[in-house]
Amino acid sequence: MAFKYQLLLSAAVMLAILVATATSFGDSCAPGDALPHNPLRACRTYVVSQICHQGPRLLTSDMKRRCCDELSAIPAYCRCEALRIIMQGVVTWQGAFEGAYFKDSPNCPRERQTSYAANLVTPQECNLGTIHGSAYCPELQPGYGVVL
């Protein structure tokens, strides 16, 4: 009788592991999965225009709206990761490096660009929810272990 319950429990545990594994692959916040390759182009343009005062001659409100629209199209659980990718980059499962789009320039340090990008989900910018349940990506803030 005990063997029967052990077998049933083992089967239930294996099924739970299988389900968890299957769902985690579909929810991967990687370029080509839940994120597009080369994500957040409008946001990169918006950040550079705000911090470096370079880029297209568009109204700031138009650039911000495009960025927020682009960021809102990304699942909430991947928004912080999408911002991290444009700031620091990532090696995809195919082995290709993507991201780290902000570059140092004499009048526009990369640190200022990445700091601004980290705040795009906040209420002052796009006010979008994240995996943290609020408009905040704490792991992207200086001092949280992020190398800028």
UniProtKB/Swiss-Prot annotation:
- Domain of life, source organism: Eukaryota
Q: Where is this site: Interaction with trypsin?
A: 57
Among the GO molecular function terms of this UniProt record, one is:
serine-type endopeptidase inhibitor activity
Q: How is it modified after translation?
A: Five disulfide bonds, which are essential for the inhibitor activity, are probably present.
Q: Which InterPro entries match?
A: Allergen/soft/tryp_amyl_inhib (IPR006106), Allergen/tryp_amyl_inhib_CS (IPR006105), Bifun_inhib/LTP/seed_sf (IPR036312), Bifunc_inhib/LTP/seed_store (IPR016140)
Q: Where is it located?
A: Secreted
Q: Name one GO cellular component term.
A: extracellular region
For this UniProt record, give its keywords in alphabetical order, as a comma-separated list: Disulfide bond, Protease inhibitor, Secreted, Serine protease inhibitor, Signal
The protein's matches in Gene3D superfamilies, at most eight in alphabetical order, are given as: Plant lipid-transfer and hydrophobic proteins (1.10.110.10)
Question: Which CDD domains would you find in this protein's record?
Answer: AAI_SS (cd00261)
One GO term of the biological process aspect: defense response
What function is annotated for this protein?
A: Inhibits trypsin in vitro. Probably plays a protective role through inhibition of insect midgut proteases.
A further note on this protein reads: The sequence heterogeneity suggests that more than one gene exists for this inhibitor. The genes may be alleles, or multiple loci could exist.
User: By what name is this protein known?
Assistant: Trypsin inhibitor CMe
Q: Which gene encodes it?
A: ITR1
